[in-house]
Design a protein with these regions (language model features):
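His/Asp/Glu-rich mid-to-C-terminal helical/loop segments that flank catalytic regions of hydrolases
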Residues: 215-232, 262-263, 305-309, 319, ...
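Midchain, well-structured core segments that form catalytic/ion-binding scaffolds
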Residues: 16, 96-99, 139-140, 148-351
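Substrate-recognition/cap regions that form aromatic- and gly/pro-loop-enriched pockets
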Residues: 327-412
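Active-site metal-coordination/substrate-binding segment of hydrolases
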Residues: 58-140, 145-156, 191-194, 314-321, ...
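Zn-dependent metallopeptidase/amidohydrolase metal-coordination segment
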Residues: 329-345, 349, 408-463
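Acidic/His- and Gly-rich active-site-bordering loop/insert found
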Residues: 3-97
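Active-site-adjacent substrate-binding region
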Residues: 217-220, 224-241, 387-430
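Acidic, glycine-rich active-site loops and adjacent beta-strand->loop/helix elements
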Residues: 70-72, 104, 133-141, 162-166, ...
């Protein structure tokens, strides 16, 4: 039985493949190449490239690089028992969309893997030589694309399948850097009234694509509310702060525990008022909170510094494009906050198409952190992909799209960090376009794939390759 592109995607959903743990999916792809007698290579980190020779009559056509990443963001609802390392995703179809039960679906970027496998297994269409690159760890460190052997790739035309809107092609992507803000924690014994402040219900989303929606962030909201408490004379001393799971996902919920000597009813009423104000700022999100009393035996010394930093730290879109209406070119996401026995850490992800703007924003955060005695460690810096106004591949894509659908292909930049940034740095002469089906609310448990658009992208690409 011949598998179609949706069959391949469903198979991918049955194989655990969170970022950094793509081995099982990589094994499946390697076995696929062997079964189809296709040349391939796999490196130590887990990247795979599979080659499909040109169709008869296409030997003199320039080769094409198709690319996508194997890993997925592993996010789930708080009441989910799903284990991303061992369990297959529980998928279901509803109203033309494919969903996963209480977890991310991994359409970002499992659809790319599915499309490439479907094309590699299909001998019914005309095409140049195909180089299909499957990378790992895109959602976390980008280590996969940085470890790709340059000698693997001969093509100078690249089609990235990491897009998530039909009829759109990215024309640039942001570079970025992750900052870890650290406060060494000295815990002191205290037996004042304890509280558990849980901020929840926010939509979250990808900190590249959804940041322009100006969605609420649980870490930022908690910081603003608790800073207001301090400003109005309430006693707030943190015991622990834990929020978010991924640096590149807008924080949907967080638990902030603290002690206070302030009047219980007055404190609760004040926090309620401040949270009602926050709800009014995000009318399209089901923002909610709980504030429960608890008994705890310790607090973090000088935790005011953390509250002030959270309230004052830049967040969201810092700068919009001059050329593309309402598209961010500089942003910052508060992704994770974690308390250990030794420290409290806040992980930020900064994105910018422009290296100068990125350095200025990093300096702003470093300066703010230093005022409150916090250290800053930059890691996981990655490169942007600059707009090429003379792209011949994009010109061909636009013409083919107009011919197929009688409408214009939309060109958009993205604040998302794409592997195209590394590819364009390694191969400055690489001509790059992106495409993909409609993937909605990626990086959240509400993620869903519009099934008909998966077929649409697959079929369009299959036909377009015959024209290249």
């Amino acid at each position: 039985m011949i598998k179609d592109v949706l069959d391949y995607f469903k198979t991918i959903c049955s194989i655990p493949h969170p970022s950094g743990h793509e081995e099982l999916l990589g094994n499946y792809i390697e076995e696929f190449a062997q079964n189809h007698e296709l040349d391939y290579a796999r490196n130590e980190i887990g990247d795979i490239i599979i080659y499909k020779e040109a169709s008869p009559g296409y030997d003199d056509h320039a080769p094409i690089l198709l690319q996508g990443h194997m890993d997925m963001v592993a996010e789930k609802d708080v009441d989910s028992n799903h284990d991303f390392f061992t369990d297959p995703l529980e998928i279901y179809e509803e109203d033309g969309y494919l969903h996963a039960t209480k977890t991310t679906l991994g359409a970002d970027d499992g659809v790319a893997v599915a499309i490439m496998l479907a094309l590699l297994s299909d001998n019914s269409f005309k095409h140049p030589r195909l180089e299909c690159l499957f990378t790992v760890q895109e959602e976390t460190t980008m280590d996969g694309i940085t470890h790709v052997d340059k000698d693997w790739i001969h093509a100078r035309k690249m089609i990235s399948l990491d897009g998530d809107v039909v009829g759109e092609t990215n024309v640039s992507s942001a570079g970025g850097v992750q900052l870890t803000i650290r406060k060494n924690a000295t815990f002191v014994e205290s037996h004042d009234q304890g509280y558990k402040f849980y901020v929840k219900g926010l939509l979250g989303g990808h900190s590249g694509d959804a940041i322009k929606e100006e969605r609420g962030n649980a870490i930022k909201i908690a910081g603003l509310v608790l800073k207001a408490c301090l400003d109005n004379g309430f006693d707030i001393r943190f015991s622990s702060l834990n929020a978010g799971q991924k640096a590149n996902a807008i924080c949907r919920d967080g638990l902030f525990t603290f002690q206070s000597t302030s009047n219980k009813e007055e404190l609760k009423a004040f926090i309620h008022e401040r949270m009602e104000e926050q709800k009014a700022l995000y009318p399209l999100e089901p923002l909610d909170y709980t504030l429960e009393e608890e008994q705890s035996g310790h607090v973090i010394l000088d935790s005011d510094a953390l509250i002030h930093f959270l309230a004052l730290c830049p967040y969201g879109v810092e700068k919009y494009s001059y050329y593309f209406n309402h598209f961010p070119v500089l942003s910052l996401n508060l992704g994770i906050m974690e308390t250990t026995e030794k420290a409290v850490e806040i992980i930020l992800l900064l994105r910018s198409e422009n290296e100068i703007n990125l350095k200025l924003l990093v300096n702003e955060v470093e300066t703010l952190a230093s005022l409150f005695g916090l250290s800053v460690t930059p890691t996981d810096e990655y490169y942007g992909w600059s707009y090429d106004p003379d792209s011949q591949l994009r010109k061909s894509y636009k013409e083919a799209y107009k011919k197929a659908y009688n409408k214009e292909l939309k060109e958009v930049p993205t604040q998302g960090g794409l592997e195209t940034g590394y590819v364009s740095r390694i191969f400055p002469d690489m001509d790059i376009v992106t495409m993909g089906p409609n993937c909605i609310d990626i990086h959240t448990p509400q993620e869903r794939l519009e099934i008909k658009t998966l077929y649409e992208v697959h079929d369009f690409l299959k036909n377009w390759l015959g024209e290249l």
